[in-house]
Amino acid sequence: MLLTRQYIDKAFWKKLIAIGVPVSLQSMLFSLLGAIDIFMVSQLGEAATAAVGVGNRIFFFNLAVVFGLCGAVTVLASQYYGSGNLSGIRRTLAQSWFISLVVTLPFIWLYVVYDKEIVSFMADDPEYVGYAREYLVVTGLSLLGTAVVVPIESVLRSVGEAKMPTYVSIAAIVVNVFLNAVLIFGLLGFPQWGVFGAAVGTFISRFFQTGVLVYFFCRRYSHLLPTLSDWREGTVKKYRNKYFKVSMPMLIHDALWTGGLIVYSIIYGQLGVTELAIISFLSPIEGVLISTFMGFAVAASVLLGNDIGAQQYDRVEKTAWWYVLTSAVLATILFFAVWICSPLILNLLEKSPLTDKQMALNVCLVLALGMILRVFNMVGIGGVLKSGADIRYSIFIDTFGQWAIGIPLTYYTGMVLGLPLHWVLMSLLVEELVKGILTTHRIQSKRWINNMVDDDTSVTA
């Protein structure tokens, strides 16, 4: 199980940093944007805070669906790149673009036509519903850009180019923060639109990101743009089945997982608008902390996928544990840092519009504690198991942990026992513990290592 030092050399660190750091930075900035949005909107009250939080959860659900559909890009393109097959990368990108757009369009229609019904599932407070509807309709339209961006980002990372998506994301985030501040509060002579202004700012920034990324991708990586023959090959049964063999299980996995997150939001909403506002306020902050480790998961998926494609199986077995254990140790250090800084955090919460400051601090500490297990599982499942296309067992781990343990415990502790929010969240650690045990067993078994491209002819142009 333990790796030898022969594989952790200068070249390894160079690749890890080149992929992991930009991805973590991009993920952190994306989460930080959510935190800034929530902080700005929180000045309008708890109903507005809850509305934007729910809207972001719904957007995250669709983002995860697109990621699931494009999961085959990361798995297959990484292995194609390791085997030197560029035509396979182009074909996979064509397939992911087509499928992402086909699946995303019906969701956009639902969010525009049935906006009231959707947001009312979370809570029925009239002020909250009004805010949530206008936020969902506008941001829902921006999902079209997401369906274009995610496949490109997946391909670029699979070939070791993680900087370009990060730079573009940074620019988009700067645009988003500026527009949100201007349109929420009516600065520089613009109208004061409140929650609607936050939605408009998000909409514009996402299409700004789409346009800039497509432009640079076409200029610098034109050799990875699908040709007409690549689009045709993507419809061939052999390649179509290979793509769906990876992407459909990942779609089911991500849809069930994020669907579970929405169920959690519904339960929190039934506890009260205050509890929903606390979760909406703190979840983006938790996301910023967890996203610092996202680079480990993506780097593990890409680099292990490259090694599997190159059939370097001894290296794969020994470096897999390094990713998982190192990230878990770092997450533990981060938890203690949050715990030590709890007086400072409470002082900052005093300046927030949240009414129950002590509950918010307790929730913050529980979320920080849960990061240790969440990071372990994120890297183990989303990084290691994903690199070997072990999708079905990944689905089992996440689905069983969430729907058989996490959701029932949340409902029982919150709705039946009526425990405070922080104790409800504490019960969720049982879910993460069970998932961690299952992940450990699977990695040790080595049955997650599957070479999906060894039957393809190597093509370099």
Where are these regions (language model features)?
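Short alpha-helical transmembrane segments in multi-pass integral membrane proteins
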Residues: 1-20, 77-144, 191-247, 304-370, ...
